[in-house]
């Protein structure tokens, strides 16, 4: 199955990549809300590689695509409502040993989706996959 093809040698499969995006964006959205409601809260890191090996990483990707759609809808509502000063709010990331502002986080997660989409697009081209109409 194409979804179980690693996007690069030794890398995650397309399926794991989609589930990773949902996991990552769920965590980011919660961190975002914490920063909007608390003063520089310390967020909880997680081991994304271990999460990618949990049993839910074998589910059909539709579950994570639906999760991403829902999170992005909610996140969009928050972003649309934010004032300039809200983007200066921060959270502390213990693995990075620094605070991250919501403006930086917004750009980071917009990039994150595009970055992983590019992995899949390159795989499709490299493998010369075609999709019926």
Predicted regions and their residues:
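Short, contiguous alpha-helical
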Residues: 4-49, 73-76, 90-133
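Acidic/histidine-rich alpha-helical segments that form the ligand environment
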Residues: 31, 51-89, 109
């Amino acid at each position: 199955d194409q979804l179980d093809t690693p996007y690069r040698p030794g890398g995650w499969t397309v399926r794991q990549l989609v589930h990773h995006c949902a996991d990552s964006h769920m965590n980011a959205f919660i961190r975002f809300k914490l920063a909007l409601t608390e003063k520089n809260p310390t967020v909880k890191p997680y081991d994304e590689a271990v999460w990618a090996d949990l049993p839910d990483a074998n589910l059909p990707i539709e579950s994570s695509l639906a999760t991403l759609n829902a999170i992005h809808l909610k996140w969009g509502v928050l972003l649309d409502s934010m004032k300039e000063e809200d983007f200066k709010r921060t959270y502390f990331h213990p693995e990075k040993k620094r605070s991250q502002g919501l403006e930086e986080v917004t750009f980071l997660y917009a990039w994150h989706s595009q970055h992983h989409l590019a992995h899949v697009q390159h795989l499709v081209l490299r493998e010369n996959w075609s999709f019926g109409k």
